Amino acid sequence: MRFTTALAMTATLTMTTVTLGPIQASAHGKPQALTPTATGYGGAVSTVDPTATAVGLDVLRRGGNAVDAAVAAAATLGVTEPFSAGIGGGGFFVYYDAQHKKVHTIDGRESGPATMAEDVFVDPADGQPYDFQEARVSGLSVGTPGTLATWEAAAKKWGTRPLANLLRPAAKVAEDGFPVDATFRQQIADNAAAFGQFDATKELYLPGGAPPAVGTTQRNPDLAATYRRIANRGTDEFYRGEIGADLDPV
């Protein structure tokens, strides 16, 4: 099943020069040769959010490798980009081993129930598929989130830091807050009707009944506590413990 969000990450380990530059297609569909906009050594981190990127860079500066940085940055995106990332969804982790020139991929997409029938998205009343949007946000589309297990597997196999250490920077961002930008505010505005249906999301994303203003500080103390609880007790706390029970009380 493909429920809520998807998160794709790429971790690259290399000892060669890191060169970053835009790639544009020519009229014939081939990339044009452009002058690099940045050149450096030691590593690079790129995400859609400056706070998450800064977390990844800090991990590298402290001696972590690309996998450590990718996991820490991804966990931070769960705070700053909750509409497209986070432990409530799934995704893929792509790792390139430069020494052996081999690509490894962890499939961490969500899994549906083992008893799920093939026609679960067909309305038995008329034999027609349910409306896509209705089916997407209903209980029919719920799957077991794979993101957290993916991070743990990647960290154990290729990283140099335990998952607990890689979750703590994200927990600090969630507790201290991050600046709201125009994109974050617009994403909340686009989902305001849905957020307004629940007290928890209304309080978090609609303070005073409206999306937070650009430039204000957004905090998520509950997510900070969740990350720290998982860091202290392990991922079983999410999948088999109290956090999981809160997610699925049935």
Spans of model-derived segments:
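Long, structured ligand/cofactor-binding scaffold of large enzymes
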Residues: 58-60
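Noncatalytic scaffold domains of N-terminal-nucleophile
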Residues: 28-54, 66-233, 238-240, 245-250
